[in-house]
Swiss-Prot record:
Gene that this polypeptide is encoded by: amiA
Enzyme Commission numbers on file: 3.5.1.28
Its job: Cell-wall hydrolase involved in septum cleavage during cell division. Can also act as powerful autolysin in the presence of murein synthesis inhibitors.
Leader sequence residues: 1-34
Knockout or disruption consequences: Mutants are growing in chains of 3 to 6 cells.
PTM comment text: Exported by the Tat system. The position of the signal peptide cleavage has not been experimentally proven. Can also be exported by the Sec system.
Protein name: N-acetylmuramoyl-L-alanine amidase AmiA
Length: 289
């Protein structure tokens, strides 16, 4: 099988199309996203897009796992899939109250393949994508919240590597193999778009962590990076938020309370709002130059 190498000399999407990449057969999500990004994104920059309805920004919230995939399970039987859905719904309500069009990848106990979650974000024209989790670890003492962005250079820590590998196996629970259907996107679009997208994802992560810190312990003070499949969007800034470790007895107890779920959801939503304020200020500043 031949290997595609990044076409670093091609700087515009029109050039990429003329190079014949559009004629290649890409399956499912890859084809739809590739066409969208090659034709619509300019100068290789990832940015919030103008919305059709009322100019609202769109944030797609992805409650991790669902259906046959329970996610991590706490000592007392709490299931990650239920906890994160409740948190995601809280985040959605808060963002909507602030004029942001927040949508869920799932609103019930259903299984959605990882790549389909990414595709949902693109179909909704998302400005941001956030996958919400409450994962587990072999050591029940592991505790605190973390935020992750995509890395195409390897994991930033052993924990990031462990969690990404664990999350990337989610499709296998339902008998689906999570193959890299976007291999060509990684090779070509990463050169054109992904660098800025990852930078914005890291910035989004820092805003969320800053808001979580006063209300809950942080497992990592900085946005970590790893090759999470669900974060592989070429142009939509994307993060994965580990709200807590459900395998930690105390954090499992907290996750079971409506008060804590609301508290962590508020912090996450405030982080998103803070990020948009930052982005608008950056944009206004650049126009003055």
């Amino acid at each position: 099988m031949s290997t595609f190498k990044p076409l670093k000399t091609l700087t515009s999407r029109r050039q990429v199309l003329k190079a014949g990449l559009a004629a290649l057969t890409l399956s499912g999500m890859s084809q739809a996203i590739a066409k969208d990004e090659l034709l619509k994104t300019s100068n290789g920059h990832s940015k919030p897009k103008a919305k059709k309805s009322g100019g609202k920004r769109v944030v797609v919230l992805d409650p991790g796992h669902g259906g046959i995939d329970t996610g991590a399970i706490g000592r007392n039987g709490s299931k990650e899939k239920h906890v994160v859905l409740a948190i995601a719904k809280n985040v959605r309500s808060i963002l909507r109250n602030h004029g942001i069009d927040a949508r869920l990848t799932r609103s019930g106990d259903t299984f959605i393949p990882l790549y389909d979650r990414v595709e949902i974000a693109h179909k909704h024209g998302a400005d941001l994508f956030m996958s919400i989790h409450a994962d587990g670890f072999t050591n029940p003492k592991a505790a605190g919240a973390s935020v992750f962005a995509l890395s195409n250079r390897g994991a930033s820590s052993a924990m990031a590597k462990y969690l990404s590998e664990r999350e990337n196996r989610a499709d296998e629970v339902a008998g689906k193999k999570a193959t890299d259907k976007d291999h060509l996107l990684q090779q070509v679009l990463f050169d054109l778009v992904q660098t800025d997208t990852i930078k914005n994802s890291l910035t989004l992560g820092s805003h969320i962590l800053k808001k979580i810190k006063p209300v809950h312990k942080l497992h990592s003070r900085n946005t970590e990076q790893a090759a999470f499949v669900v974060l592989k969007s070429p142009s939509v800034p994307s993060v994965l938020v580990e709200t807590s470790f459900i395998t930690n007895p105390e954090e499992e107890r907290l996750l079971g309370t409506a008060a804590f779920r609301q508290k962590i959801a508020t912090a996450i939503a405030e982080g998103v709002i803070s990020y948009f304020h930052w982005f608008d200020n950056q944009k206004a500043h650049s126009k003055k130059r």
